[in-house]
């Protein structure tokens, strides 16, 4: 009997250790910073992008917004289209403003401004990720700042985690700045937080069944949204997409193994939006693979022209 109890205790401890390690892996993703961009030979700050249309080097401003007593860093670039909207880019899990630079390259000719920020626990921002629970509040603060500084029309664009944050920020928001949001672009969105968590763990060869469920349950409890992530209000991004009062464009790769294309379709349909399915597209690389980058840019261009 003693041996059985000892083995059971050992199994319990081992399980809790795996769950704890999984929680840490999910809530503290690798930080994508200037050094990581340099190691891959990619731009690490806005000034390293291609020159402006007139041949002048790209310039930008650095500033921060306050969120939960934390300063979140922002890059603010001037675009080439004076009559275009300001576009605010919100990154995915494990990404940062560095990843936004790839998209900024395509957006600068279409926008009057391109604004990029690091969410908590990513890039150069302090803290740990909030997993999309309330980052929309920080994004709303950012929208207010952008509008107050001279941009009356704003497009929100995000990918993966940032796609859901963008949809949530623009939905059912009645403050004055909300009327300045003229469109939302969601790249590789997902409906529920557990979906990319399971798929990311699977891709990394880690336990992704009930271990992931337990880990996300503990994370939800810690973030105040409950074990099932709906203590205060549902997380489901489809629900918030249905509340949008502006056009929605969804870009989704059909080979996406992190955010299912079915989620993107459901979100687009809820908002009566436009879904661009990319047959060769995966979760990553839509803007660095030539075939998908061209399709994404054309959809982006047409959307910005439509809403500006």
Placement of each model-derived feature along the sequence:
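Catalytic nucleophile-loop/oxyanion-hole region of alpha/beta-hydrolase
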Residues: 120-150
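Conserved alpha/beta-hydrolase
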Residues: 107-126
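Catalytic histidine-centered segment of alpha/beta-hydrolase-like enzymes
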Residues: 281-294
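Gly/Ala-rich beta-loop-alpha elbow adjacent to hydrolase catalytic centers
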Residues: 158-166
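An N-terminal hydrophobic leader/cap segment in hydrolases
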Residues: 2-66
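Conserved alpha/beta-hydrolase "acid-adjacent" motif
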Residues: 257-263
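Hydrolase active-site cap/lid region
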Residues: 171, 175-230, 240
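Short beta-strand/loop motif that positions the catalytic acidic residue
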Residues: 243-244, 250-252, 256
